[in-house]
Curated annotation (Swiss-Prot):
InterPro entries: PP2C, PPM-type-like_dom_sf, PPM-type_phosphatase-like_dom. This is Putative protein phosphatase 2C 76. CDD domains: PP2Cc (cd00143). It catalyses: O-phospho-L-seryl-[protein] + H2O = L-seryl-[protein] + phosphate; O-phospho-L-threonyl-[protein] + H2O = L-threonyl-[protein] + phosphate. Mn(2+) 1 binds at D138, G139. One of its GO terms (biological process) is regulation of intracellular signal transduction. Its EC number is 3.1.3.16. PROSITE patterns: PPM_2. One of its GO terms (molecular function) is metal ion binding. Mn(2+) 2 binds at D138, D397, D448. Gene3D superfamilies: PPM-type phosphatase domain (3.60.40.10). Residues 92-457 form the PPM-type phosphatase domain.
Length: 499
């Protein structure tokens, strides 16, 4: 299985995973694994970075550029006449990234929807799970960390899904390799406990019926663990690169998985992820907030529009926050920093680690790791999307320099209602929603880079794409992963924007 970027590409990783689960279901007990024993050992020892670099895993090749190879660090993402045009962005993703008043662009964004991942379900049936990945990376002290994170996150995530399933299926079907050695017991305690209980009652080396763990919760835990490992490995890869090249940059990471109507958020730093959810709160305060927001956006507001909003009896949007900022003035974050020998000092009105770094968790920032700055994400639990959840939004902190999350949700309502004269008629499928957020942040005077990803939710807005849009299987049937085009763009005054 070779993942490449040639024109003859067809359903790559999905085909690889399908082959794996079919092999597990039909192969003899000692031949259940899809990878060689040596490659599995490489994975267990060093994770995704080791697999992509090892000669023992020739089927896996990462073609993404290193952090020091250039890219969008200058803030103007220009297309080259010698390079093929970027692939179309998945429908349903609204992405905008703007340099703002900064000299360089250090923000990055990723949005991939409709990734179909096959799992073995109960009764030996193959179940394809629809997965979406939304992420924002806010770089600082350079774009190297955010650039590498945006290039590697999805590749690492999907590789971990593949290898975790390979290892788990091998154990469940009593493959001769015995037990997992790469922290597999951390996937889920109740899953592993079921393994131990069932292993004690079955003869060694025999395949046995799939246990009850292969219900809808099994794949959710595999995906969650894959996300955690992907973020860990992105930091590991970048930190090694930073030491080699004397990079001092770091990055936030706000990542959301969307899986079969449920979401989970992993956060490192102070980028934000949240939902705008419909509420039939018709209070005067809510109406005043929306109307005044409109007036702030355009001083010469149309009185008719104000009247329409003031008399609007439909649902408003409330914020459902999915992430918490990692600043060193947070009590638990400060305690960790101080326990590691660092200190927190307020400078220019901002609490900073050792008086310098304004974050207590980050990808990269290698000089501060010894002082308690960690890349470990703070993770929510899986939560079901309700019928009222209308927009999923991830943004860098540049958006919130002059705005609040509620301001963003109020803006989405005004856009949806189409009452702003300058917005014209509104159609989700024809206009980039993220542009509205970025434009308003800049209009309000933010000086930072700005990035926003918006995914409209609900059946009215849903538009699925298949894994074929991202991964294709080449004819030579070997495996390598090519970099995904994370922000297909049209240049617009230093901005990347796409719908």
């Amino acid at each position: 299985m070779r993942l490449g970027c040639s024109g003859r590409r067809r359903r790559l990783l999905r085909a690889a995973l399908l082959r794996l689960v079919v092999l597990v279901l039909v192969a003899p007990p000692r031949r259940c694994a899809g990878e060689s024993a040596t490659c599995l050992a490489v994975y267990r020892e060093g994770g995704a970075p080791a697999v992509f670099q090892s000669a023992h895993c020739p089927r896996w090749t990462l073609l993404a550029p290193s952090a020091g190879s250039g890219g969008e660090g200058d803030g103007d993402r220009r297309s080259s006449s010698s390079s093929p045009p970027p692939p179309p962005h998945p429908r349903g993703c609204h992405v905008a990234v703007d340099r703002g008043r900064r000299r360089s662009q250090e923000d990055r964004a990723v949005c991939a929807l409709g990734i179909r991942i096959p799992f073995i379900g109960i009764y030996h049936k193959i179940k394809e799970v629809d997965v979406g990945v939304v992420a924002v990376f806010d770089g600082h002290n350079g774009a190297e960390a955010s650039e590498m994170a945006s290039k590697l996150l999805l590749e690492y995530f999907l590789l971990h899904v593949y290898f975790l399933l390979d290892g788990i299926y091998s154990i469940m079907f009593r493959k001769s390799t015995g037990k997992l050695t790469y922290k597999e017991v951390t996937i889920l305690n109740n899953v592993i406990n079921l393994y131990k209980e069932d292993q004690s009652s079955h003869s060694k080396g025999s395949c046995w019926a799939l246990p009850a763990i292969l219900d809808r919760s099994f794949h959710m835990e595999v995906l969650k663990e894959s996300l955690l490992r992907a973020v860990h490995d992105v930091d590991l890869t970048f930190s090694k690169e930073a030491l080699r090249n004397n990079f001092e940059s770091g990055s936030t990471a706000a990542v959301i998985l969307i899986v079969d109507g449920q979401i989970i958020a992993a956060n490192v730093g102070d980028s934000k992820a949240f939902l705008c959810s419909e509420s039939h709160d018709s209070s005067i305060d809510k109406k005043t907030s929306v109307v005044s927001g409109k007036r702030r956006r355009k001083r010469n507001s149309n009185n008719r529009d104000d009247f329409a909003l003031a008399n609007y009896d439909g649902p408003f949007y409330n914020v459902k926050e999915l992430t918490k900022d990692h600043h060193p003035d947070r009590e638990d974050e400060r305690s960790r920093v101080e326990a590691a020998g660092g200190y927190v000092l307020e400078w220019a009105g901002v609490h900073r680690v050792n008086g310098e770094l304004a974050l207590s968790r980050a990808i990269g920032d290698v000089p501060y790791k010894r002082y308690g700055v960690i890349p470990t994400p703070e993770l929510t639990e899986w939560q079901s999307l309700s019928a009222n959840d209308t927009f999923l939004i991830a943004s860098s902190d540049g958006v919130f320099e002059k705005m609040t999350m509620q301001d963003v949700c109020d803006l989405m309502l005004r856009v949806k209602l189409g009452v702003n004269q300058e917005l014209g008629s509104f159609a989700v499928t024809q206009r980039n929603l993220a542009d509205y957020v970025v434009d308003l942040a800049l209009e309000k005077g933010t000086t930072d880079n700005v990035a926003a990803v918006i995914v409209p939710l609900g059946s009215h807005y849903s538009s699925k794409v298949t894994l074929e849009d991202w991964y294709m299987l080449e004819e030579n049937s070997k495996t390598s992963i090519s970099p995904l085009q994370t922000i297909p763009y049209q240049q617009k005054s230093g901005r990347f924007n796409v719908q």
